[in-house]
C-alpha cells in the first residue's frame, strides 16, 4: 500500500451545536448518512451533549477524508456519501456509497480514520491508501529549500 493522501480536521463542538439549533436539526440530516443518523438520534436521546459530540466527530471526519482524497467537498465527495461507523470494539471505519464508492474503487483507495472529542473540540485524522501497483496516488510535491 502507498499513501494516497492525508487529511485532518478540528471542529468546535459549540459551533456544531449552534448550527444544529439554528437549522432545527436539518444540519444533521444534511451531513450524516443513514446509519450515522440512527446513531446520532440514539445518542442524542440519551444525552444531548453526546449526540452533539457524535455529530461534530462525523462532520470532522468527513472534512478530513475529503482532504485526504484531495477533492475537498466536491463531487463525488458529498456529506452523505461517506459514513464513519464503529466496529464493536469502538474502532472507527469509513464506508463510502454511490459515486464516491465507485470513484474510490477505480483508484484502489482505502482509508483509515481516527476521531476524538473533548468537551470543546472534535478532531479527526484520515490516511487514504492505494494499492502500490496503481498509479492513482498524486505525485509528491518537492520540498523547496531557501538559500541561507
From Swiss-Prot:
SUPFAM superfamilies assigned: 4'-phosphopantetheinyl transferase
GO molecular function, a single term: holo-[acyl-carrier-protein] synthase activity
Enzyme Commission number(s): 2.7.8.7
Protein name, per record: Holo-[acyl-carrier-protein] synthase
Lineage: Bacteria, Pseudomonadati, Pseudomonadota, Betaproteobacteria, Burkholderiales
Entry's localization field: Cytoplasm
Entry's Gene Ontology cellular component terms: cytoplasm
Main location: cytoplasm
Keyword Nucleotide-binding (UniProt): no
NCBIfam families the UniProt entry points to: acpS, pantethn_trn
UniProt entry keywords in alphabetical sequence: Cytoplasm, Fatty acid biosynthesis, Fatty acid metabolism, Lipid biosynthesis, Lipid metabolism, Magnesium, Metal-binding, Transferase
GO biological process terms, semicolon-separated: fatty acid biosynthetic process
TM stretches of this protein: none
Similarity remark: Belongs to the P-Pant transferase superfamily. AcpS family.
Cofactors required: Mg(2+)
Presence of keyword Lipid biosynthesis: yes
Catalytic activity reported: apo-[ACP] + CoA = holo-[ACP] + adenosine 3',5'-bisphosphate + H(+)
Binding site for Mg(2+): 9, 63
Function comment: Transfers the 4'-phosphopantetheine moiety from coenzyme A to a Ser of acyl-carrier-protein.
Amino acid at each position: 500500500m502507498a499513501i494516497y493522501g492525508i487529511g485532518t480536521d478540528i471542529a468546535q463542538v459549540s459551533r456544531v451545536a449552534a448550527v444544529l439549533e439554528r437549522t432545527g436539526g436539518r444540519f444533521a440530516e444534511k451531513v450524516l448518512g443513514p446509519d450515522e443518523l440512527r446513531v446520532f438520534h440514539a445518542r442524542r436521546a440519551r444525552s444531548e451533549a453526546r449526540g452533539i459530540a457524535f455529530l461534530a466527530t462525523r462532520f470532522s471526519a468527513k472534512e478530513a477524508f475529503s482532504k485526504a482524497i484531495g477533492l475537498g467537498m466536491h463531487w463525488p465527495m458529498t456529506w452523505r456519501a461517506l459514513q464513519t461507523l464503529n466496529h464493536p470494539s469502538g474502532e472507527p471505519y469509513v464506508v463510502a456509497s454511490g459515486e464516491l464508492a465507485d470513484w474510490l474503487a477505480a483508484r484502489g483507495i482505502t482509508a483509515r480514520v481516527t476521531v476524538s472529542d473533548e468537551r470543546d473540540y472534535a478532531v479527526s485524522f484520515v490516511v487514504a491508501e492505494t494499492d502500490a501497483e496503481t498509479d492513482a496516488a498524486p505525485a509528491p510535491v518537492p520540498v523547496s529549500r531557501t538559500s541561507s
